[in-house]
Swiss-Prot record:
Domain Globin residue range list: 2-148
Modified residues (Phosphoserine): 4
Catalytic reaction(s) noted: Fe(III)-heme b-[protein] + nitric oxide + H2O = Fe(II)-heme b-[protein] + nitrite + 2 H(+); H2O2 + AH2 = A + 2 H2O
Subunit comment: Monomeric.
Name of the encoding gene: MB
EC numbers: 1.7.-.-, 1.11.1.-
Binding-site list for nitrite: 65
Residues binding O2, per UniProt: 65
Family that this chain belongs to: Belongs to the globin family.
Name this protein carries in UniProt: Myoglobin
Subcellular location: Cytoplasm, Sarcoplasm
GO biological process, one term: removal of superoxide radicals
Length: 154
């Protein structure tokens, strides 16, 4: 299920656009996640009280968390599938401390794709979208495998 060198190049090229505005992209991804899947808010004590997209947009904590999420994901993507060292602590914290189900990782992957389509439609054609979808699926599958090792049924 790995990606070709060409697919990784597509992923990292579009990710460069994300890194040019981590705060904006991160905020948009989390707002999309929380509005499309409100049940995900229950996992975030800091954000549970945010009920509207406008409230979310005004939250500095949400913006900071968006940067944290996309910074971690960017570090994983740059490893081009050789991300064992990055995945292990992330899976550990998301399984044991935060108890984030794999389904929610699918939801945030959908949110990332949606935001990239909206912000970079000219640079996010079917080839780039397909490569990014594969990269995010690889990430989710590897997190799910670690969850299983940890005995987390997320």
């Amino acid at each position: 299920m790995g990606l070709s060198d060409g697919e990784w190049q597509l992923v990292l090229k579009i990710w460069g656009k994300v890194e040019a505005d981590l705060a904006g992209h991160g905020q948009d991804v989390l707002i999309r996640l929380f509005t499309a899947h409100p049940e995900t808010l229950e996992k975030f004590d800091k954000f549970k009280n945010l009920k509207t997209a406008d409230e979310m947009k005004a939250s500095e904590d949400l913006k900071k968390h968006g940067v944290t999420v996309l910074t971690a994901l960017g570090g994983i993507l740059k490893k081009k599938g050789q991300h064992e060292a990055e995945i292990k602590p992330l899976a550990q914290s998301h399984a044991t401390k935060h108890k984030i189900p794999v389904k929610y990782l699918e939801f945030i992957s959908e949110a990332i794709i949606h935001v990239l389509q909206n912000k970079h439609s000219g640079d996010f054609g079917t080839d780039v979208q397909g490569a990014m979808s594969k990269a995010l699926e690889l990430f989710r599958n590897d997190i799910a495998a670690k969850y299983k090792e940890l005995g987390f049924q997320g």
